[in-house]
Each structure stands twice: as C-alpha cells, then as structure tokens.
Amino acid sequence: VFNHKHMEAKERFKVVYSAGAKEFLQRITSKAREKIISNARKASYTIDPKLFKKLTGTDLWEFRTLYDGKQYRLLAFWDKTKEVDTLVIASHGFIKKTDKTPIKEIERASKIMKEYFELK
C-alpha cells in the first residue's frame, strides 16, 4: 500500500520577488498571477523543466507558465550567499511572443542580477 502521508515534500529553494517582478505580477490578471505564483511554488519543490529551467549560455533561469494561451516568464537568478543557499530572485517578468527568450529580457535580468550583488 502506497502511503502519501510519509511523502513530505521538501522545499528545494526559496523564491524572492524583486520590485520589478512584483510590478509585473500586479499588471497582469489575478488568475494569471495566481497561476504564476502557484507554478513558482511548485517549482521550488519539484524538478520540472516545464516550470523552471536554465537559459542556455547564461546564469539565468526562467519560471515558465502557460496560461490562457500566453507564455508568461519570470527570469531569475540564484543567491547562494544566504543560509538557504538556494535562494532564487525573480528579477522581472514578461509575456513571450515566440519560442526564444528575447535578448533584451536576458540583458535586463543580467543587469538586475549585477546590481543586486553590488548592493550586498
């Protein structure tokens, strides 16, 4: 017999939303926002590249949500300087029109990451 009660899920990392990510979440519909936050929470417990994956050739990761036919993305980076050495900072969000993540979004997230670590 398979017992679910003993399958305690362990959070693998904490998600912290930057001001830019929070602004993005405020601008979209509440249903889309709930779905994105729910997926980010889910990603912190599971390994699912449909929800959270590394952007090739960068130090950035993206939280991925498909909702109501739209591809929502929150770009993120790791901060391993804290005790929870797997803290993820979601830098900002955008809605993707194509399969590729736009270079300008990657550059923006890289700039936010650089500023974040300079302020530490």
PLM segments and residue spans:
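Basic, Lys/Arg-enriched alpha-helical interface segments
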Residues: 1-71, 80-88, 95-120
